[in-house]
Structure formats: structure tokens, C-alpha cells
């Protein structure tokens, strides 16, 4: 060995178990490991075989932390405190990875902030400001490895998300159908969502579905597969007609997604002659329903007969179009009950008006009649319920023949398609049209229940579109959880709250430094929810000590509101 050679030795515990003469022995040695001319050498410093297990573990622990023995402290020298919420963020993040959402978004800072907005939407609906405040209560920075941010960073991330929406949707589409191949049937429907304020760039007054009269709105289109899995979404100006949104969806399927075989399923009024022509240009097909007026015309022309309508499906082909007919007895009874309910309401109003006329001799009977007539017209029963006067009284005369004529198509519906019988059976056509209920459920979840899209507080068009896209990505997570937890007696919202209640435990040393964060064993319900997802929480998570704070302060805003209120009283 060279006289100036440097030997670096590492001390370790050599703990071995071996069998000799049928007996199990344990040998524990305290040894040094070093290299001489490139070869590993060992020297034994002490034989610890006679030491107790506790003593051996203590020596191992000391060697493991020999560079910082101050961290080896007694139980009396530490204290614990509740840490950040871990369960919901951890599970949703893992689910986002499984569904390809994380991969589609990418690993940039904007991608991670976008992912947090998606997770936050499922955990607790709100604005970008509330999502920033949420990050102070949830271990989002530790789990997503995010640095400090404020609400302005989230708005910038929305701009980024809007610019990358098409790429992300394409990536998710590829991930979803990589193994089973692209589907043939696609469900499409639209809804509207009201806006707060008058300054949204896409906001217009149009056909309102939210019952918010006087408010501007946007129109939202959503396409799913036959199981209701969201594929893409698009936002239009609030006065856009439903049919005007279809052409863009056809272009997406033919261009961006590159699908060759498409059958678009849309409700009556969505797919009309223009849309059918657009679909035909791409060699695509359609499934839709026809209106009551169209049914009556086909009956008048002899194409259909009332006897065809039955509980069992009936199919008629005419001029290359297949018509699938059925009468739903439950729906028929519901319509009949509504009709009778309207007549009852009209009779109550008539009785009220007659009482007023009797108590007020100077009251004009014609005014009362017009009031009742307006009510019947509003309820659309004036064709068979005639409002007239007899002396100083108003009465309702029902025409049984006209009422029966209106009721003859109660519960009847007709689905039409240009698909050949070889491509899809009668039952398949009927089932795919009924699958539109999946899109309706998606809108209901996105707008009113779990995800609460309404009202929208952003102004710019690109951020409005990004907001809706975030909701769609969040619905993917909710969609998956609904199926994973289908046999657990709670809603997805309740399940998320249970997971969010799982918080880390911070272990603080005597010098006030955070040593580590452990995750406690969940309650029984939490265990069940985790088991259903096939996930388990880690024993601990890293602590990055990232400080997240809002630029806009609630206290400052409250003070401003108080000052404004005081000034308004002067």
C-alpha cells in the first residue's frame, strides 16, 4: 500500500441468520467496510450477538443518523400537531394518473396548477381565490411538488390550459381507447350556464335552462361515448342555437380525433336536415328522435300507424330511413296526470274569479274571463279547454274529442337513423338513444350537484372555456369514483369529505423544527373507500414547507364592503 493512501471506512451492523445442525443461529457484528486497491475489505470491531434486540436496533438507528444525532430525541422532547389534509388530494392525484389526466397535462408548473384546479373542483367547489386558500389546508404542494403560488398564477394557468385544450383532449382520447379501439357511438348534447355580471366576453341572452331570468349565459356542448365518459367540451356564445354547435363536433371527430366510423346520437331538435347533410359529407351516421308534429305527419302520410305504437319496439323502414317506435305506458300516464293537473289549476282559478265577481258587483266579468284564458293559453290547454262566460260567471268547457286527440300520442316516441340493419339492431339503436341520459347526468353533476359549475365569475373568453374544461376533467374523476364506490352507502361528495378528513401528523422536535409528517390509519369508512379504489395511503409524505397565500385578502375586502355600506347610508 502506498504510504500516502487514504482509506475511507464505513461502520455498519452485519446482522445474519444461519442454520447449523438443524438449529437457527443469529450473528451480529459491528464492522468496518473499506477498499484496498479497489477491493472491499472488512474488519470486525465487536461481536454484538449477545446484545438484546433493543440494543442492536438502537445501535443501527444511531449509525443511520450519525451525521445528525440531534434528531434522535426522546418522546418527551417531541410534540405532535395536526398537519394538512392528505387523503382527498392523494387519492384524486393517483386517480388522475390512472386516467391519463396527469400525463395529458404534463409536468410543467402550469400543468400542475391546472391539475390542482381540477382536484380542488372535486374536493370543494369555488373560485380560483378559494382554490388558493384551499391549498393552505391541503397538502397539495407536498403531493404535487408545487412551489408557492397565488390566485394570479391560477388565472395564468387557465390561459395555458385553454391554449393546450385540444392537445390534452386528444391525449385523453388516445389513452382511453388505446386497447379496446375507438368507439362507434358518440353522445352529444348542449346546456347553458348563467353568468354573474354582464362583462363576460361570451355572455349573451338566449334560451335559458337555469331559471335565471335576466342573466346572460353561455352555451356548453359536451360529447361522450355511449357509457357517458366525457371526450371533449366546447363553449359557445349564450345566444347560439343548439343545431349550430353540431358542425364543430363533426369536424373534431373527423379531424382532431381521426375517427373514421362515427354515429352521432343527439336529441330531437339537435340533429336536423343540415346536420344530417354535414354528417353525410364525412360518411358519418346519426341517431335522433323526431318531434310530435313530424310523427303526426308520418301517420297522415301512411308511413306510420297508431297500432304500431306498443310497449315492444317496432321498426319501420321508409326511403332509406329506419324508424323505431314505442309507447311508454309510464310516461303516458305521467303526461295524462299533468294534463289533468293543469285543468284542476284552471278550475281553481275560475272558482277564485267567480268568488271575486260575486263579492264585487262592479267587477267586469270579461276581465275575469281574459285572465283565466291567459292562464289556459300559458298552460297550453286552450285547444280543448274553452274559457267562456255564463251571465256573471266564468266557466270551463272541455271538448272530450279534442282532448282525446291530443292524448293519443302520450308516451309515444319515434327514433330515426340512417344506420343499416347490419350495422346496428333495433334494440341497439333504441339503447344508444336512451344513453343520452348519461350526458344529462353529466350536465347535472357538472352544473348543480358535486362540481357546481354555476355561476361563472371569469370575464375573458379563454378563461371561461378553461373553466368549463376544468369542470369536465373533474367530472372524469367523479365519474370514476361513482363507479368505484357504487356499493358504498354514500355519495361521491360525502366520500371526498371523508377522505379529506384524513390529515397528516406533524412531529416537531424540541428545537421547533418539523422532523417529519406521518399519516395515521384512517377510520373504518376511510379504509373501505381506499380499498374500493385499490389504493393505500403512504406512511409519510415529504414536507416542502411551501407557503401559499392569496394576493386578495378577505379581511381587506370586508373592510371595503363595510366602508361602502357606511357611505351609502350617509
PLM region descriptions:
Residues 1-11, 58-66:
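Basic/aromatic DNA-contact patch characteristic of tyrosine site-specific recombinases
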Residues 2, 9-15, 20-27, 32, ...:
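Anion-binding and metal-coordination hotspots
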Residues 18, 24-25, 32-107:
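DNA- and nucleic-acid-binding/regulatory domain cores of transcription factors and nucleic-acid enzymes
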